[in-house]
């Protein structure tokens, strides 16, 4: 067993109540939650109130320690999961705190799911801190989230944009918080390149043959995400059709677009109808992968692909891009949210940071980027919203621009695509990007330890002078960005 970072005896560890998806689930949140738990089980003890819809095991407490021991290669983890319908409520959290006596709460997902928790934050923070692994898709900075951010002691920001947003929204109160960048990390034991020398190469060939139905293609585009509006799945199909027109029918016949998604979804659209309306089956090969894939199979899908495409108009991170990078596969993405991080936009070779004066690169001010990526800059930036989230930019790229990006990647040729994909993999798993589970969990330990050390319990009550509330005015640039 290799030496673990900051290994602590079980009886001396802090216990953390993790509120998120059931870590046994295959959702993005569940997967990242599981990686954090397994990668830190030698340093923290964990109790996961695991949310789901109509969970069949709701209310049971399951001891996962033995399974975690095997995966983490340790002998004394303490990991329990209590499945629950939804993400929890005040009563169940009070009960867990009373029985399990956690030293902190860590929450992970959209803040709107935690309003009930933020409303009881003083009750909780009299004794233990609240840590928040958070993300926000886009600007303008959500000033309506200020009470939520103020309710936390530590803010772990999944994207550079989110860290900037946390600091902008909190204003002067940011100095009283720990705010750190913590990008998603992929387990490189599960996602990796499968080349001819790899032991699984024969499995890969058989899987590829099955997926492609015994056909040979020169160029394969992959999409792995939900069929919901903000993912712009229909635009992706339209972009692929336009790409086929650019290269001509005969070359297009040797290309394919595979979408691993649910083709019909009430939160998205009917992709079968989109394909029928836009794609001539004679030369526009669009296929849907609808079977549930195990992680090993999904890794092979990324290895089959020449490029992974994600054109979301709002995207906090874009986990499919990260998975693609660590398998050595190039990416095409809309320049928005956390997808920008993965394209490594740079100025004079230095990876850019985001500030109030330069909150995003979605306006295309900086063109220098990692050679493993082909960015598509939004052609329209409009403001969408709803009563709970009154305003947020909707960064839509034009399908014709995405088609041109596909053409660029296609014209590179297979050897150059492979070389660039390998450069992306090296960067993603390296010490600058740190997009691996090992990097992520080490950072979790460092930041949460800092949070425990600096925690100051809130007093039972405070006196406030009643004054007019200040106007909630955006104080960062909305146009005419400047990067220094």
What are these regions (language model features)?
Residues 2-4, 434-482:
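C-terminal alpha-helical cap of glycosyltransferases
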Residues 80, 268-296:
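Nucleotide-activated donor-binding/catalytic signature segment of Leloir-type glycosyltransferases, i.e.
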Residues 18, 213-231, 237-240, 257:
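Conserved donor-binding/catalytic core segment of Leloir-type glycosyltransferases
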Residues 161, 185:
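Carbohydrate-associated surface elements
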Residues 1-66, 70, 100, 475, ...:
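N-terminal subdomain of nucleotide-sugar transferases
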